[in-house]
């Protein structure tokens, strides 16, 4: 018999009854029922009930066992007594009568229990992540993550993509966030950077004559903590294709993402024909560029009903042509208590309030806005929004560029409060026609709005003749249930167009050569039209595991202060190491 096991803890069935078996694993739970000990033994594969009574030669040692001790148990498989079977377990018809126990690894007192799913402070869970990972839900999430990555690889290869590994040590570049810098010992004063994405390398692969590239790529960004992103690193399904237009990328990617979602959605419906929503339309209807399409509420411009009306606050705003009034329908929200609750929520978000109209039985409007604009305008708003008695509408006004984010939050809040969001489906969509540039209010300059390597719609001619803020890019995102899960674009592969695009954003040709010299040189030697995208592995896994916390699908994540509490990173290093790197510390004063 094998030194440690003849079977795993998830393997035994009726067919093994009367066999002598050997199991090894962790003592998941130990119960004493009238002097008979029941030990639930757990390993990676499952759980088996082991029984020791006073007649067992191993009973004395069994009494000393504690939770999470690692043991080897020998015994005979037998059928559980009638009425004690556990249909929730694959091994639930069988138990092991214990004849021998060997303690392989005793455990100290546990800082958090493995049995059960009690909530514990996050810092404790991260410091003792090796215990946390033994817990059933987190353990299963990590296994699901591995299966999802396997599925991605298989489906990408079926689409004709080949897997490559691009460098981890690279050059620093202004792709968005701060780089993690790695000092060079051999070249004092110079630094490598960990890649924010394999962007330049994957484009260089297309210029090297390869046709369809992908990898599950680690990416590193020195960003301030955000609720929807783990600090430090994340993984993406990265891909690039040669001789393609936007529709070709869509045709290659949709079957992969749809297939992965359908495989792991546990029967929940998944969008088959993805809508394509222009960026501007997405802001106008949903107040976000990552809409949750499970929420049926659509915002509408109702400015005409307030222009010149008796509600002077909105009427005066509308004298400025850039201002608008948007309405968010609230079907079933036509009570004073609900409207007041929404108004209080808006004030909690830093807004002066949230105007509303309610419609009573009989169809008349109620509330301060209705009283000020009169019954005809109130009725016109009701008709435009398709509302009825018992419904409400909520209003935001001003410059849409300044209020659309809040309007989107209000739409989401209404959908949640009114129970309009179907949680049991996955709604996927393309967001297209992103603006190439945006105005940076802080720096008072035009900046790239997304990926600086995207092709402008209209090419070099658009860059030379159009107002930069009106130029659209061949840039696209995939959204699912309110999350951006992928982003990409058709690339700007002509060197003169690339230089012009960066010039508009304030970079001269010398800047381009200095920062992107390798790719710029490659553009001079025959660059094919190419495009691609990157899908966030972590977010996709998070959605498919039914959680909203990225730490619940990551092995050893950092906390929100970018600290690895298990390994003690970041840490101080020895003075000798700093001297070898020619680094002197200049720490901030407390």
From Swiss-Prot:
Location within or outside the cell: Cytoplasm
Superkingdom of the source species: Bacteria
Binding site for ATP: 221-223, 484, 536-539
GO biological process: aspartyl-tRNA aminoacylation
Primary localisation category: cytoplasm
Site description Important for tRNA non-discrimination, residues in chain: 33, 83
One Gene Ontology term, aspect cellular component: cytoplasm
Ranges for region Aspartate: 199-202
Keywords tagged on the record: Aminoacyl-tRNA synthetase, ATP-binding, Cytoplasm, Ligase, Nucleotide-binding, Protein biosynthesis
Enzyme class, first EC level, given as a word: ligase
Catalysis performed (reactions): tRNA(Asx) + L-aspartate + ATP = L-aspartyl-tRNA(Asx) + AMP + diphosphate
GO molecular function: aspartate-tRNA ligase activity; aspartate-tRNA(Asn) ligase activity; ATP binding; nucleic acid binding
Binding site for L-aspartate: 175, 221, 450, 491
Keyword Cell cycle: no
Enzyme Commission number(s): 6.1.1.23
Function: Aspartyl-tRNA synthetase with relaxed tRNA specificity since it is able to aspartylate not only its cognate tRNA(Asp) but also tRNA(Asn). Reaction proceeds in two steps: L-aspartate is first activated by ATP to form Asp-AMP and then transferred to the acceptor end of tRNA(Asp/Asn).
Subunit text: Homodimer.
Family that this chain belongs to: Belongs to the class-II aminoacyl-tRNA synthetase family. Type 1 subfamily.
Name assigned to this protein: Aspartate--tRNA(Asp/Asn) ligase
Organism: Nitrobacter winogradskyi (strain ATCC 25391 / DSM 10237 / CIP 104748 / NCIMB 11846 / Nb-255)
């Amino acid at each position: 018999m094998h030194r440690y096991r003849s079977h795993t803890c998830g393997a035994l069935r009726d067919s093994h009854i009367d066999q002598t078996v050997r199991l090894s694993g962790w003592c998941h739970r130990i119960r004493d029922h009238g002097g008979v000990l029941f030990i639930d033994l757990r390993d990676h594969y499952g759980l088996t009930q082991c029984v020791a009574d006073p007649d067992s030669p191993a009973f004395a040692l069994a009494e000393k066992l504690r939770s999470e001790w690692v043991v080897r148990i020998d015994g005979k498989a037998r059928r559980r007594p009638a009425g004690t079977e556990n249909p929730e377990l694959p091994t639930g018809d069988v138990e092991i009568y214990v004849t021998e126990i060997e303690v392989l690894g005793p455990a100290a007192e546990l800082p958090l229990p493995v049995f059960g799913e009690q909530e514990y402070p996050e810092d404790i869970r991260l410091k003792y992540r090796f215990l946390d990972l033994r817990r059933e839900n987190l353990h299963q999430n990590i296994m699901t993550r591995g299966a999802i990555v396997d599925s991605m690889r298989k489906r990408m290869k079926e689409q004709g993509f080949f897997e490559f590994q691009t460098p981890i040590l690279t050059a620093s570049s202004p792709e968005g966030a701060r780089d993690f810098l790695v000092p060079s010992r051999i070249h004092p004063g110079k630094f490598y950077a960990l890649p924010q994405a394999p962007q330049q390398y994957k484009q260089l692969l297309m210029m090297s004559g390869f046709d369809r590239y992908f990898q599950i790529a680690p990416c590193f960004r020195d960003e301030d903590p955000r609720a929807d992103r783990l600090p430090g690193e994340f993984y993406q399904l990265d891909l690039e294709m040669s001789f393609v237009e936007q529709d070709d990328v869509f045709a290659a990617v949709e079957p992969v993402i749809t297939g992965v979602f359908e495989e792991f959605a546990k029967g929940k419906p998944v969008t088959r024909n993805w809508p394509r929503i222009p960026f501007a339309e997405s802001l106008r209807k949903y107040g976000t560029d990552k809409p949750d399409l499970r929420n049926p509420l659509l915002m509408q411009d109702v400015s005409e009903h307030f222009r010149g009306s008796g509600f002077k606050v909105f009427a005066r705003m509308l004298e400025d042509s850039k201002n608008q009034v948007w309405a968010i329908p609230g079907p079933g929200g036509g009570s004073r208590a609900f409207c007041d609750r929404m108004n209080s929520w808006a004030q909690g978000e830093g807004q002066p309030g949230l105007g509303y109209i309610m419609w009573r039985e009989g169809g008349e409007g109620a509330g301060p806005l209705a009283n000020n604009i009169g019954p005809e305008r109130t009725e016109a708003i009701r008709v435009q929004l398709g509302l009825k008695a018992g419904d409400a509408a909520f209003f935001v006004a001003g410059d849409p560029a300044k209020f659309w984010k809040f309007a989107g939050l209000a739409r989401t809040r209404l959908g949640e409060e009114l129970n309009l969001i179907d949680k049991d489906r996955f709604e996927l969509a393309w967001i297209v026609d992103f603006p190439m540039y945006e105005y940076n209010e802080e720096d008072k300059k035009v900046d790239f709005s997304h990926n600086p390597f995207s092709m402008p719609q209209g090419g070099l001619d658009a860059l030379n003749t159009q107002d930069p803020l009106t130029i659209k890019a061949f840039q696209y995102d995939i959204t699912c249930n309110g999350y951006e899960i992928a982003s990409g674009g058709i690339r700007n592969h002509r060197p003169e167009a690339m230089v012009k695009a960066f010039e508009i954003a304030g970079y001269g040709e010398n800047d381009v050569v200095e920062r992107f010299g390798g790719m710029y040189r490659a553009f001079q030697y025959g660059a094919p039209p190419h495009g691609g995208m990157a899908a966030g592995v972590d977010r996709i896994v998070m959605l498919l595991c039914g959680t909203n916390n990225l730490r619940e699908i990551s092995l050893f994540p950092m906390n929100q202060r970018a600290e690895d509490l298990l390994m003690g990173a970041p840490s101080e290093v020895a003075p000798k190491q700093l001297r070898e790197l020619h680094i002197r510390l200049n720490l901030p004063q407390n």
